[in-house]
UniProtKB/Swiss-Prot annotation:
Taxon lineage: Eukaryota, Metazoa, Chordata, Craniata, Vertebrata
Gene symbol of the encoding locus: Hmox2
Entries under Gene3D superfamilies matching the protein: Heme oxygenase-like
Protein name: Heme oxygenase 2
Keyword list, A-Z: Acetylation, Endoplasmic reticulum, Heme, Iron, Membrane, Metal-binding, Microsome, Oxidoreductase, Phosphoprotein, Repeat, S-nitrosylation, Transmembrane, Transmembrane helix
UniProt topological domain (Cytoplasmic) ranges: 2-294
Length: 315
């Protein structure tokens, strides 16, 4: 008689015990939250390493560029929340519908008013990259609403994860009010604990009645969402290269080529600040050079070329 005790199905106890962890791991990997986490890791890493995101996290952001990014977010969330409202009763999405806790459009409108004024809608338009993202969201909401999960997951979970960090970076780099004007997007007033809410949201995702094929399609759609975001970042990088860095209001005074040279930031950085005689202010040199008519003509031609390229890019 065998020393191993067999079960009624003919599987001995040792084999049954060895299969238990495998079954548990398979169940875990079948969870939509785990599939999304693993299936979008590469795209997530690439998005985090785009130049725009790296510059933002370093506080190297111009206000005009931040305004363009806020505009892109406004159009993106307007589309996403319109489609979420449309599908709030759809069984594949209804358990993830939390307008009070998550919706960002109202907060973004406040930010747009702060940056552009009351007539902000007359001043902004959806960029080419953002429009592609918006079009995709509308298509999904109207034709494949089960895939809305991918876009909600990509946007809201990311906002809850890094929102407070980005808010502080923006406030510090752009000298925005600590009272929240201009950064309402990052404030989730009705979420007391972001980590707990994310866990709750993931549990709701995992409870959705979806087959494995649909889950795989959601992962694929989430990767598309990351790609659309990266296209917007790339567009912002291009726009940023055309914008002059905004001078902070409390920065060092700029020497105008006249008067006390010690007001020049270049001079202030020199180790031998006690002697004026040997100092050469680059601002003075630049002003003198640009006063030459021939170089003024070259500069004007260069500006015209850049303007022409910009016009072509935005056509």
């Amino acid at each position: 008689m065998s020393s191993e005790v067999e079960t009624s199905e003919g599987v001995d106890e040792s084999e049954k015990n060895s299969m238990a962890p495998e079954k548990e791991n398979h169940t875990k990997m079948a969870d939509l939250s785990e599939l999304l986490k693993e299936g979008t890791k590469e795209a997530h890493d690439r998005a985090e390493n785009t130049q725009f995101v790296k510059d933002f996290l370093k506080g190297n952001i111009k206000k005009e560029l931040f305004k363009l990014a806020t505009t892109a977010l406004y159009f993106t969330y307007s589309a996403l929340e319109e489609e979420m409202d449309r599908n709030k009763d759809h069984p594949a999405f209804a358990p993830l519908y939390f307008p009070t806790e998550l919706h960002r459009k109202a907060a973004l409108i406040k930010d747009m008013k702060y940056f552009f004024g009351e007539n902000w809608e007359e001043q902004v338009k959806c960029s080419e990259a953002a429009q592609k993202y918006v079009d995709r969201i509308h298509y999904v909401g109207q034709n494949e609403p089960e895939l809305l999960v991918a876009h909600a997951y990509t946007r809201y979970m990311g906002d809850l994860s890094g929102g407070q960090v980005l808010k502080k970076v923006a406030q510090r780099a752009l000298k925005l009010p600590s009272t929240g004007e201009g950064t309402q997007f990052y404030l989730f007033e009705h979420v007391d604990n972001a980590q707990q809410f994310k866990q709750f949201y993931r549990a709701r995702m995992n409870a959705l009645d979806l087959n494995l094929k649909t889950k795989e399609r959601i992962v694929e759609e989430a990767n598309k969402a990351f790609e659309y975001n990266m296209q917007i970042f790339s567009e912002l990088d291009q726009a940023g290269s055309m914008l002059a860095r905004e001078t902070l209001e409390d920065g060092l005074p700029v020497h105008d080529g006249k008067g006390d040279i010690r007001k020049c930031p270049f001079y202030a950085a020199q180790p031998d600040k006690g002697t004026l005689g040997g100092s050469n202010c680059p601002f003075q040199t630049t002003v003198a050079v640009l006063r030459k008519p021939s170089l003024q003509l070259i500069l004007a031609a260069s500006v015209a070329l850049v303007a022409g390229l910009l016009a072509w890019y935005y056509m």
